[in-house]
Amino acid sequence: MAALDLRAELDSLVLQLLGDLEELEGKRTVLNARVEEGWLSLAKARYAMGAKSVGPLQYASHMEPQVCLHASEAQEGLQKFKVVRAGVHAPEEVGPREAGLRRRKGPTKTPEPESSEAPQDPLNWFGILVPHSLRQAQASFRDGLQLAADIASLQNRIDWGRSQLRGLQEKLKQLEPGAA
């Protein structure tokens, strides 16, 4: 009876793996399309604005990421990746906010440190009125980042499923020598 349960579990795991592989291929196809679309839109923007107007010389001297990739442990030790906007988790300020010496005579305001809550949009590096194709390129690459994180999570789930499949096959081989 244990062999029948093991075979049923093996069958369900194989079906899950096949579904995950099909989903992985679909997401990879969409990712390739998004990246291709992004590069094509970037080429259109370079054509519209001029080759020298869209290039590395317009990049900011100090760049900050707009998104971060967070890895978290899900069920059964699987790692899941998630794309999170960079402004969501701001580091906390440590230390005194006020100056060391204060004048007691009058209420004077101490200047508050400037905090950039939202990171600057990189499209502003190329001017105020940028072509629509440059915005399309940014959106395509942003979608590609999300898809890449989903693909990495899915690939981890597939690897975990393959290791589970091998383990179940070994158990079945021990229960029924000559089968499997």
Swiss-Prot record:
<comment type="subunit">
    <text>Accessory component of the multisubunit proton-transporting vacuolar (V)-ATPase protein pump.</text>
</comment>
<dbReference type="GO" id="GO:0005793">
    <property type="term" value="C:endoplasmic reticulum-Golgi intermediate compartment"/>
</dbReference>
<keyword id="KW-0968">Cytoplasmic vesicle</keyword>
<keyword id="KW-0256">Endoplasmic reticulum</keyword>
<keyword id="KW-0458">Lysosome</keyword>
<dbReference type="GO" id="GO:0051082">
    <property type="term" value="F:unfolded protein binding"/>
</dbReference>
<dbReference type="GO" id="GO:0016471">
    <property type="term" value="C:vacuolar proton-transporting V-type ATPase complex"/>
</dbReference>
<protein>
    <recommendedName>
        <fullName>Vacuolar ATPase assembly protein VMA22</fullName>
    </recommendedName>
</protein>
<keyword id="KW-0967">Endosome</keyword>
<feature type="compositionally biased region" description="Basic and acidic residues">
    <location>
        <begin position="92"/>
        <end position="101"/>
    </location>
</feature>
<dbReference type="GO" id="GO:0005764">
    <property type="term" value="C:lysosome"/>
</dbReference>
<feature type="coiled-coil region">
    <location>
        <begin position="153"/>
        <end position="176"/>
    </location>
</feature>
<keyword id="KW-0900">Congenital disorder of glycosylation</keyword>
<dbReference type="GO" id="GO:0030137">
    <property type="term" value="C:COPI-coated vesicle"/>
</dbReference>
<dbReference type="Pfam" id="PF21730">
    <property type="entry name" value="Vma22_CCDC115"/>
</dbReference>
<dbReference type="GO" id="GO:0036295">
    <property type="term" value="P:cellular response to increased oxygen levels"/>
</dbReference>
<comment type="function">
    <text>Accessory component of the proton-transporting vacuolar (V)-ATPase protein pump involved in intracellular iron homeostasis. In aerobic conditions, required for intracellular iron homeostasis, thus triggering the activity of Fe(2+) prolyl hydroxylase (PHD) enzymes, and leading to HIF1A hydroxylation and subsequent proteasomal degradation. Necessary for endolysosomal acidification and lysosomal degradation. May be involved in Golgi homeostasis.</text>
</comment>
<keyword id="KW-0175">Coiled coil</keyword>
<dbReference type="GO" id="GO:0007042">
    <property type="term" value="P:lysosomal lumen acidification"/>
</dbReference>
<dbReference type="GO" id="GO:1905146">
    <property type="term" value="P:lysosomal protein catabolic process"/>
</dbReference>
<dbReference type="GO" id="GO:0005768">
    <property type="term" value="C:endosome"/>
</dbReference>
<dbReference type="GO" id="GO:0006879">
    <property type="term" value="P:intracellular iron ion homeostasis"/>
</dbReference>
<dbReference type="InterPro" id="IPR040357">
    <property type="entry name" value="Vma22/CCDC115"/>
</dbReference>
<dbReference type="GO" id="GO:0070072">
    <property type="term" value="P:vacuolar proton-transporting V-type ATPase complex assembly"/>
</dbReference>
<dbReference type="GO" id="GO:0005783">
    <property type="term" value="C:endoplasmic reticulum"/>
</dbReference>
<dbReference type="GO" id="GO:0016020">
    <property type="term" value="C:membrane"/>
</dbReference>
<keyword id="KW-0225">Disease variant</keyword>
<feature type="coiled-coil region">
    <location>
        <begin position="16"/>
        <end position="37"/>
    </location>
</feature>
<feature type="region of interest" description="Disordered">
    <location>
        <begin position="92"/>
        <end position="122"/>
    </location>
</feature>
